[in-house]
């Protein structure tokens, strides 16, 4: 067997699959810097912890200066990861408002912060933010031990 040829085929296949996956996500729709405030809540899950986290902050979304507020709940799962839900988030900008819901899975980082990946859906009647409607957005969410967080959004194509 020609290992050089075999490896070349594997690398080519990997690159083609990677290109396909990258096409699934569009260009970054926005980024926001947030401040978290968290408190423990009853999880009802056999002694595993749960947290309620409120966030407030701002940044850019679809080229607009925005402010956002949301409340998330996250429940620790038996494997130590966290399952998070935001049932009510709001985006404010001079051109209108939008609401959103998110779900994500995350883990504690060695630094003491958290790292989540997930998806969000938005609804708005604002023409300026109307591009949010009817799309699913993937997100990355990272926070530090002091509760300073970064939220980055990417539309799924």
Segments (PLM) and residue ranges:
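Beta-strand-enriched cores of mature, soluble protein domains
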Residues: 11-157
């Amino acid at each position: 067997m020609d290992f050089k040829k075999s490896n070349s085929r594997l690398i080519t296949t990997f690159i083609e699959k990677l290109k396909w996956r990258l096409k699934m996500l569009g260009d970054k729709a926005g980024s926001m810097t947030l401040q978290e405030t968290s408190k423990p809540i009853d999880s009802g899950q056999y002694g595993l912890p749960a947290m309620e986290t409120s966030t407030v902050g701002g940044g850019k979304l679809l080229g607009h200066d925005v402010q956002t507020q949301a409340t998330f709940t996250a429940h620790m799962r038996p494997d130590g990861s966290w399952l998070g839900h935001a049932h009510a988030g709001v985006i404010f900008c001079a051109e209108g408002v939008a609401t959103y819901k998110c779900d994500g899975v995350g883990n504690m980082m060695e630094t003491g912060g958290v790292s989540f990946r997930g998806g969000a859906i938005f609804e708005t009647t604002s023409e300026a933010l109307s591009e949010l409607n009817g799309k699913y957005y993937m997100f990355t969410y990272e926070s530090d031990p002091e509760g300073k967080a970064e939220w980055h959004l990417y539309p799924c194509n």
